[in-house]
Amino acid sequence: MLRGRRVVTAVTGVGVANGAMVTALFIERFHPTEVLVSGTGSRFNPRIRTGDTVISTKTIHHAAGNLTNQGMVYRKVRGPLAGQMTSWYYRPDTRLLKLARAAVAGYEAEPVTVNGKAYRPRVLAGEVAASDMFGVSDAKIADLKAKLNPDIMEMESAAIAQVCTQLGVPHIVFRAGSNRTQSNPGNDYRKLGQTAAAAAARWTVYFTGCLTAVVKR
């Protein structure tokens, strides 16, 4: 039990294939009422600080489509069923998104200290992009900024959102910013990843309690 609700937690591992596989097995085995995705991501939006948690309003496969000399051209691809096409982006469940937006006002994040500066992280709505790329080049960053301009980049949520959507399970994605988006994030992620993961987890636990309160009304 967590905040009055029966929950099952699963660790996906890194990457879109792992995210999709674990989500499909999770749904098949446990038949969840909804799926909450909690984790970290690099800060594409410079206004997002380490520990700020983004409620995803749109979760994007940023490597789905054609890679041309002018950068990515995003497009649908064929799904597992005959005649089915899958999108390159997914929206969260409207009910969960409405509840998450409303829950922000009552949430007080734990203070963090990053690079000697103490502050209280925020929770805000934004867009999340995902692929199997851990680091991305300056050229890729420029292309992403011109075409998508996401707030957070990570490696699983688009695949998780796709599986949830195709299997008819409501979902919502929460990702806290860690390091800035860059070509070689390893050292920065090791320094900042735990702070971001803890921030996302605290918000997710709080939101779980909000879901419990709604059910009891």
Regions from the language model: what does each represent?
Residues 45-147:
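Mid-sequence, gly/pro-rich, charge-dense loop/helix-turn segments that line enzyme active sites
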Residues 20-24, 52, 97, 201:
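Extracytoplasmic/secreted envelope proteins and their assembly/folding machinery
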Residues 34-36:
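Structural motif
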Residues 130-173, 182-183:
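A C-terminal functional module that forms or caps the active site or interfaces directly
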Residues 1-30:
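N-terminal short beta-loop-beta anion/metal-coordinating cradle
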Residues 181-217:
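His/Asp/Glu-rich mid-to-C-terminal helical/loop segments that flank catalytic regions of hydrolases
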Residues 12, 16-19, 89-93, 153-154, ...:
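Solvent-exposed, acidic/flexible segments
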